[in-house]
Amino acid sequence: LRNYIRLFGEFYVLDRDGNDITSLFTPKLKQLFILIMLHSSRGGFGISSKDLTRMIWGNDNPSKSTKSLRSVSILKLRKILERIDTVEVLFNANRYILQLSEDVYCDYLACLDWLKDKRVRTQPDFEYFYDIISKGEVFKGESFDWMDDFKSYICNSTVDVLSRFID
């Protein structure tokens, strides 16, 4: 595997050469990465600089040191993501957006795509979906208020899908 991001079960990232780069993500960088990804997956608008700072550092009116910390953290995250083909954190119109090419596989985004696709499902479709979710709880070990809506959506949708499959 290469260019791989797993958010179901244990957080796990492989670079373009298939090297495990998970350890490069400090807890704060992992939180930052997931936050930007989640907000980018909702219509591609990303997250405002103000909301990102409030959610990660808990400041509605950030000081210069908090803004500096945010900038340094974004730079560190970008440096890590350079190791994965065509993954970028963009800053446009005061919003951070995570952009991934189709060469990058992310189980969370694959799950969202699967859930959005309303066509009739076959046995192989359900097996593919099960393969995604069988790695474990989405964002395992992560517990932040801003994650609750995203976790709820995945959990509720998964129950709905599995209920239909059983019927």
Q: What are the functions of these language-model segments?
A:
Residues 1-30, 88-95, 136:
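Short boundary/linker motifs that mark transitions into or out of structured domains
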Residues 1-6, 71-106:
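DNA-binding patch around the recognition helix
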